[in-house]
């Protein structure tokens, strides 16, 4: 009895592996671009932590800290790439992640009319998840967001970090308000502006963006 042909996604799995060379001669990994997962989760005090990957020394830009991620395959969206790579490199389950936004943080014109992009997929987890590093990771670490810039970052991540980091915002909510269950979390208040929103008491003075934040919960 003939065997069934492999699913399309299995046939093309890995077809994104390869380099795109820019007009200036710099090589970028991913024939169809690349994507990485910027995952936040609340620390015990409610402030955000970011999951960072300490890249193995043998890898490209080894020894630096960045996001789990990699080459995008031809059949994938950036979100699918980032979630897949976070599973492969950090052992994360897609069911534990909530994607909040995608941001193209790098664009390059390559030779022969090729084009390369890096997409940062912003997501939240409800808690500091356990991780399982693969051989591409010397270490995986939850880092307090205000300490990320203190590490030796991957140059691409370092260049985009300022536009990806959050500002704190407290949302006044009654104790019985069911929206409390959705906090803390990341909210993109407008393109390139992210807030880390935590619940506050109903009698707290609302922030200037309070009404808009509430409408997005």
Swiss-Prot record:
GO molecular function: 8-oxo-7,8-dihydrodeoxyguanosine triphosphate pyrophosphatase activity; metal ion binding
PROSITE patterns, alphabetized: NUDIX, NUDIX_BOX
Disruption phenotype: No visible phenotype.
Keywords attached to this entry: DNA damage, DNA repair, DNA replication, Hydrolase, Magnesium, Manganese, Metal-binding, Mutator protein
Record flagged with keyword Glycosyltransferase: no
Additional observations: There are 4 mutT paralogs in M.tuberculosis; the exact function of each is unknown.
Protein name: Putative 8-oxo-dGTP diphosphatase 3
Catalytic reactions on record: 8-oxo-dGTP + H2O = 8-oxo-dGMP + diphosphate + H(+)
Motif placement: Nudix box: 70-91
Enzyme class: hydrolase
Cofactors demanded by this protein: Mg(2+); Mn(2+)
InterPro entries associated with the record: Nudix_hydrolase, NUDIX_hydrolase-like_dom_sf, NUDIX_hydrolase_CS, NUDIX_hydrolase_dom
Signal peptide: none
């Amino acid at each position: 009895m003939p065997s069934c042909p492999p699913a399309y996604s299995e046939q093309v799995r890995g077809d994104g592996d390869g380099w795109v060379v820019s007009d200036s001669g710099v090589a970028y990994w991913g024939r169809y671009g690349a994507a990485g997962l910027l995952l936040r989760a609340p620390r015990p005090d409610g402030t955000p932590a970011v999951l960072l990957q300490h890249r193995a020394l043998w890898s490209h830009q080894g020894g630096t800290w960045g996001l789990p991620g990699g080459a995008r395959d031809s059949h994938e969206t950036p979100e699918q790439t980032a979630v897949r790579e976070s599973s492969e490199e950090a052992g994360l389950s897609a069911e534990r992640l909530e994607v909040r936004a995608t941001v193209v943080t790098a664009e390059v014109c390559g030779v022969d009319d090729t084009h390369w992009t890096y997409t940062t997929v912003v997501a939240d987890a409800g808690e500091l998840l356990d991780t399982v590093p693969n051989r591409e990771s010397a270490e995986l670490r939850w880092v307090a967001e205000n300490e990320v810039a203190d590490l030796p970052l991957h140059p691409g991540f370092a260049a985009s970090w300022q536009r990806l980091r959050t500002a704190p915002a407290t949302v006044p909510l009654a104790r019985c308000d069911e929206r409390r269950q959705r906090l803390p979390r990341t909210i993109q208040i407008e393109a390139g502006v992210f807030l880390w929103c935590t619940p506050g008491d109903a009698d707290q003075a609302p922030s200037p963006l309070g009404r808009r934040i509430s409408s997005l919960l």
